[in-house]
């Protein structure tokens, strides 16, 4: 049977992947970072602040582009590609066959989060899945920013603080990770659609950033 604390964590992660209420996530208990995970926890907190600030600015700047959580069509670009919620199950849940992650993830081996040398396989799997999530979002945001820079109106660009925060957490997770390639665009940019897409991605990424931060906090306390 799955322990109560682990079930609570699982319910929290699933909840955060479907709802866009940061205040609810903040009401969850915050844990103290252990030495091995402190750097990644710090980076995840920086990322959460950066994406929240970027989303707030986008909602203000793009107020006529249906940029609120209630107006957008929610989309998860990691769907069917990564499985972070399942990969980040606590060990006592992961040993239950019904709780195992169902997708394959390339394992990271050289991240500073793994510096202790005692990191379990399940923790490595969780951090690897988080790294893959960040890589996908980083590539999407870079491609989107390239289009926004071509907009004659120069209305909005992505906050470099957010892109740096993503890159720093990726570096901490996998110091030998490959450089994230630019995603080429073969079509003429539609700036209206690009700005709507920006809102969709920022909402989705904030939810993921909350999930990552909660997970780092949990791992730090384990």
Curated annotation (Swiss-Prot):
GO molecular function ontology, one term from the record: interleukin-12 receptor binding
Record's subunit section: Heterodimer with IL12B; disulfide-linked. This heterodimer is known as interleukin IL-12. Heterodimer with EBI3/IL27B; not disulfide-linked. This heterodimer is known as interleukin IL-35. Interacts with NBR1; this interaction promotes IL-12 secretion.
Protein species of origin: Lama glama (Llama)
Presence of the UniProt keyword Ligase in the record: no
Regions crossing the membrane: none
Signal sequence interval, chain numbering: 1-25
Compartment(s) where it occurs, according to its Swiss-Prot or TrEMBL record: Secreted
Keyword list, A-Z: Cytokine, Disulfide bond, Glycoprotein, Growth factor, Secreted, Signal
Family assignment from sequence similarity: Belongs to the IL-6 superfamily.
A GO-annotated cellular component: extracellular space
Organism domain of life: Eukaryota
Its biological purpose: Heterodimerizes with IL12B to form the IL-12 cytokine or with EBI3/IL27B to form the IL-35 cytokine. IL-12 is primarily produced by professional antigen-presenting cells (APCs) such as B-cells and dendritic cells (DCs) as well as macrophages and granulocytes and regulates T-cell and natural killer-cell responses, induces the production of interferon-gamma (IFN-gamma), favors the differentiation of T-helper 1 (Th1) cells and is an important link between innate resistance and adaptive immunity.
Name this polypeptide is given: Interleukin-12 subunit alpha
